From Swiss-Prot:
The gene is cca. Monomer. Can also form homodimers and oligomers. Magnesium is required for nucleotidyltransferase activity. Nickel for phosphatase activity. Mg(2+) binds at D21, D23. Belongs to the tRNA nucleotidyltransferase/poly(A) polymerase family. Bacterial CCA-adding enzyme type 1 subfamily. This is Multifunctional CCA protein. Residues 228-335 form the HD domain. Transmembrane segments: none annotated. Its EC number is 2.7.7.72, 3.1.3.-, 3.1.4.-. InterPro entries: CCA_bact, HD/PDEase_dom, HD_domain, NT_sf, PolA_pol_head_dom, PolyA_RNA-bd, tRNA_CCA-adding_enzyme. Comprises two domains: an N-terminal domain containing the nucleotidyltransferase activity and a C-terminal HD domain associated with both phosphodiesterase and phosphatase activities. The keyword Methyltransferase does not apply. Signal peptide: none annotated.
Length: 416
């Protein structure tokens, strides 16, 4: 029986990156052997065991043979005669198919180290096409390692495009698509994930609402980048900058809202382009459709829909009437969900800066709207009750006093 460290731990170690999870492969053993050594079996689909001391996962070396469509249609063989090389070749990319022996030797039968040095994401064998989930995984790795200079090999991109056209992607469950996508949203360059999926044709299959933005023009005066898909990717990049060092915000929810904020632009009638009157309200339906299909968590969906509907309100914050401001606060339920409103404001800032040449633009609207929010929050509900108001009258009086507080703050707010 031999044990090897495999996959991501070896890859990241060679890249000089911190190793998060360590996976191990056991060659020349069967389940009975590991159980006798005190390992605990946890895998249902294939034998995975927890080390009694470290609690790290140890899997028996295995081979896989495609038996039906999708990413679950495989027949596995876990016999003790399976070699390390046979196990490694079933993996997706060469850089993920290296192993390290217990004495520290790197075993690299498929050129992963060379591809690591050359910054290339390359599939190992034609068997790559047997698992459609790999299209998303490779796009996610491209997003993760883009800042280190990694590119996807042209032949791998071609295989990904073939998979996108084959109909195999339709066999992916909503849960798996969303899991990969949420992971991608938390990478350093999530825009690369979506750009890669667009390049391979997978975006139109899995995220048609986002893909529909491609080629939709905006007025060049406000959007020198013109294209709505390019703008959305620039907004996503800005959202990353604004959230990566902010532990309070829900990073992936903010980034998802950034992607959805302009989905309504894909529905703009041709005869009024490049203007997009009413795109805010129009964006709610495609956002809802996307979220329902992919079973996106409700928090993400709510923030994305509200962002679609109200992002231009913040751009025009200085023009809003006090009544409109309170209606906005009520729609966001800022009284009970203050963080969600702050996350929304970050998307609005990302939207302003996600335009070519506007990357460092000041956005005083956030300070202004937060001052109005502070004033509205200062209104004491207990005082309203103490003043003798009851039931619905409490809510009506509270709204009146909040509107008055906002009006006073607007009047006193410095305009220069």
């Amino acid at each position: 029986m031999k044990v090897y460290l495999v996959g991501g731990a070896v890859r990241d170690q060679l890249l000089g990156l911190p190793v998060k999870d360590r996976d191990w492969i056991v060659v020349g053993a069967d389940p009975a052997t590991l159980l006798s050594l005190g390992y605990q079996q946890v895998g249902k689909d294939f034998p995975v065991f927890l080390n009694p001391k470290t609690k790290e996962e140890y899997a028996l070396a295995r081979t896989e043979r495609k038996s039906s469509a999708g990413y679950t249609g495989f027949i596995c063989d876990f016999s003790p005669t399976i070699t390390l090389e046979q196990d490694l070749i079933r993996r997706d990319l060469t850089i993920n198919a290296m192993a390290q022996s217990e004495d520290g030797e790197i075993i690299d039968p498929y050129g992963g180290k060379q591809d690591l040095e050359n910054r290339i994401l390359r599939h190992i064998s034609p068997a790559f096409s047997e698992d459609p989930l790999r299209v998303l995984r490779v796009a996610r790795f491209a997003a993760r390692y883009h800042s280190l200079g990694f590119k996807i090999a042209s032949e791998t991109l071609a295989l990904m495009a073939e998979l996108a056209q084959s109909g195999e992607l339709q066999h992916l469950t909503a849960e798996r698509i969303w899991l990969e996508t949420e992971k991608a949203l938390n990478e350093k360059n999530p825009e690369i994930y979506f750009e890669t999926l667009h390049k391979t044709g997978a975006l139109s299959v899995l995220f048609s609402e986002i893909d529909a933005l491609y080629g939709v023009p905006n007025p060049v005066k406000h959007h020198p980048e013109v294209d709505s898909f390019i703008h959305t990717m620039l907004v996503l990049k800005q959202a990353v900058n604004l959230t990566e060092n902010n532990p309070i915000l829900n990073k992936s929810a903010v980034r998802f809202a950034a992607i959805c904020h302009d989905l309504g632009k894909a529905l703009t009638p041709q005869n009024i382009l490049p203007h997009h009157y009413g795109h805010e309200q129009a964006g709610i339906k495609p956002t809802r459709s996307l979220c329902k299909r992919l079973k996106v968590p409700s928090y993400f969906q709510e923030l994305a829909e509200l962002t679609c509907e109200f992002h231009t309100h913040i751009h025009k914050a200085f023009e809003l009437r006090a009544e409109t401001v309170i209606t906005l606060f009520n729609r966001f339920d800022v009284w009970r969900k203050p963080q969600r409103f702050q996350e929304f404001l970050q998307v609005c800032l990302a939207d302003t800066r996600g335009r070519t040449g506007f990357e460092t633009k000041d956005y005083p609207q956030i300070d202004y709207i937060n001052q109005l929010l502070h004033a509205a929050n200062e209104v004491d509900v207990q005082q309203v009750i103490a003043d003798g108001f009851e039931k619905q009258a409490i809510k009506n009086e509270l709204t009146k006093r909040r509107i008055l507080a906002v009006k006073q703050t607007k009047t006193n707010y410095p305009t220069n």
